[in-house]
Amino acid sequence: MRNDVHMGHKARKRFGQNFLNDPYIIDGIVSAINPRPGQNLVEIGPGLGAITEPVGREVDKFTVIELDRDLAERLRTHPELADKLTIHEGDAMRFDFTQLVKPNNKLRIFGNLPYNISTPLMFHLFEFHKDIQDMHFMLQKEVVNRLAAGPGSKAYGRLTVMAQYYCKVVPVLEVPPTAFVPPPKVDSAVVRLVPYETLPHPANNLQWLERVCREGFNQRRKTVRNCYKSLMSEQVLEELGVNPGMRPENLTLQQFVAMANWLDANHK
C-alpha cells in the first residue's frame, strides 16, 4: 500500500499534507485544546478530520478553514460533522479572522499546520492577537523549540521574539513521524500560544521591532555595538540597559523593545 494515501486520499506535496492517524496523540491534542460547547473554535487545515471528529463530539458548532477542495467536500458530506461545521474553503494565510469574531467570545484556533507555511501563518495570526483566546498547533519540533527558546540559546531568533511579544508559549507534547501518513522526515510537537490581554512590553512601532530583530539575528556573531552602529551609539545602548559588547542573541524581548522604542522616538 502506498504510504502517501490515507483513507482514500493521496497527500498533496504542494499543500504540505501529512495526515495524523495515531489515536493516543490525537487524544492528547484534543485534551490540550479542551473544547467546550459555546466556544468560538476554528480549525485550520482539518484534512481528513483526525482532530475535527473528536472535537465535533464535544461541541455543537465550529468553523474550519481548508484549502484543499476535495477535503472540504468530504467535510460537507461527513455524516457526523456536516451539520456542525461552517466551512471556509481557502487559504488561511489570506483569511481575515476578524470576520469570525463574536461579542465576548474570542477565537480558539487549532490545527495541524502544513510545515512549509507554519511560520508565515503564525505571523499572520499575530495580527489578530486581540481577537484570539488561544492557539494550539502541531508544528515541526524545531519550530516549537524556536518559539519557546530563551536568550542565548541556539534556537532563539526573530520568531522567538515576535511570538513571545504577543503570546505566552507553552510546549504541550512531542509527536514522532510514525504518527502520520505519510511520515514526515522530522519530529513534530504541539504548542499552546496564549495571546496576552495586555502586552507586557509594548512597542510603539512594530516595524522598528522587526527591524532590530532582523538586523540582530542576521548578524548573530557580531556584537550589539557593531550590529546597530548605523542606528544608535554605544552611549544610547548603555542608557537603554544594553551591553554593547554582548551578542544580539543574548538580548531579551524587553531590550529589543527598548531599542525599537528609542528608534521610533529618534528616527522620524
Swiss-Prot record:
SUPFAM superfamilies: S-adenosyl-L-methionine-dependent methyltransferases (SSF53335). GO terms for molecular function: 16S rRNA (adenine(1518)-N(6)/adenine(1519)-N(6))-dimethyltransferase activity; RNA binding. Belongs to the class I-like SAM-binding methyltransferase superfamily. rRNA adenine N(6)-methyltransferase family. RsmA subfamily. Signal peptide: none annotated. It comes from the Bacteria. Its EC number is 2.1.1.182. S-adenosyl-L-methionine binds at residues 18, 20, 45, 66, 91, 112. InterPro entries: KsgA/Erm, rRNA_Ade_diMease-like_C, rRNA_Ade_Mease_Trfase_CS, rRNA_Ade_methylase_Trfase_N, rRNA_adenine_dimethylase, SAM-dependent_MTases_sf. Pfam families: RrnaAD. SMART domains: rADc. Keywords: Cytoplasm, Methyltransferase, RNA-binding, rRNA processing, S-adenosyl-L-methionine, Transferase. It catalyses: adenosine(1518)/adenosine(1519) in 16S rRNA + 4 S-adenosyl-L-methionine = N(6)-dimethyladenosine(1518)/N(6)-dimethyladenosine(1519) in 16S rRNA + 4 S-adenosyl-L-homocysteine + 4 H(+). This is Ribosomal RNA small subunit methyltransferase A. Its main location: cytoplasm. NCBIfam families: ksgA (TIGR00755). It is found in: Cytoplasm. Specifically dimethylates two adjacent adenosines (A1518 and A1519) in the loop of a conserved hairpin near the 3'-end of 16S rRNA in the 30S particle. May play a critical role in biogenesis of 30S subunits. One of its GO terms (cellular component) is cytosol.
